[in-house]
Amino acid sequence: MALEALTSPRLASPIPPLFEDSSVFHGVEHWTKGKRSKRSRSDFHHQNLTEEEYLAFCLMLLARDNRQPPPPPAVEKLSYKCSVCDKTFSSYQALGGHKASHRKNLSQTLSGGGDDHSTSSATTTSAVTTGSGKSHVCTICNKSFPSGQALGGHKRCHYEGNNNINTSSVSNSEGAGSTSHVSSSHRGFDLNIPPIPEFSMVNGDDEVMSPMPAKKPRFDFPVKLQL
C-alpha cells in the first residue's frame, strides 16, 4: 500500500500545506523522537491525513534516518593448547596434526633403543591422551597408546610372538618324535605296536618231530663163525 501511495497521482501533486510548513514538520519530527509539544500535537491533529499519506510520511522519515546498524559481536577465538610442548593452535585439527609428530618421535625413540629408565620416562612424559582424557594401556608391557586401534595393533605383536614360540615348540616335539622313531627302528621293534604272536616254526631242512618217543637204534654186528 505504501508503494501505491507513493506512485499515486494524489502524491505526485505538490506537497500539501502540512509539509510546506516547517514548524509543523519539525513538530512532527520532535514527536517521532519522543519530545512532544502541545503545539505540534495540536497542529498535527488538525490536519486530516489518510492512511496512505501517513504511510508515505513514515517512509520519508525512515529515509532521513542516518543511524547505522550496530556492529556484529566479536567472535571469541578459541585456542587449543598442546599438553606436551604447551603450543597453542587455532583449530582442533591443527592440534591433532601437531600431536601426530610427537607420536612419530616417540616411536622413533623406542625403536632406536636405550635403557629401560629413559624409555619409561619418555613414555610417561610424552604419553598422548585422547579427547576424552583416557589413555589405552597394554596389559602385557604397560605401554600407553592414544587410541584403541593403536593398542590393538600393538597387541598383535605379542600374539604373533607367542605363535612363533608355539610353532618352534611343536617343531621341537616333532623332531623328538622322529628321533624316538628312528631309535626304535634301530632296536627292531616299536613299543607303540602290539607284539606279533609267536608260532613254533621249524626249519624246512629238519624233520618234523613226532610226539611219540623215539625208538632205540639197532646196531648190526657181523657174526664171526668159529671153525
Swiss-Prot record:
Residues 96-128, 168-189 are annotated as: Disordered. It holds the Pfam family zf-C2H2_6. SMART domains: ZnF_C2H2. This is Zinc finger protein ZAT10. GO terms for biological process: cellular response to hypoxia; multicellular organism growth; negative regulation of DNA-templated transcription; photoprotection; photosynthesis; response to abscisic acid; response to chitin; response to cold. Expressed in roots, stems and leaves. It comes from Arabidopsis thaliana. SUPFAM superfamilies: beta-beta-alpha zinc fingers. Plants overexpressing ZAT10 show growth retardation and enhanced tolerance to drought, salt, heat and osmotic stresses. Plants silencing ZAT10 show enhanced tolerance to salt and osmotic stresses. Gene3D superfamilies: Classic Zinc Finger (3.30.160.60).
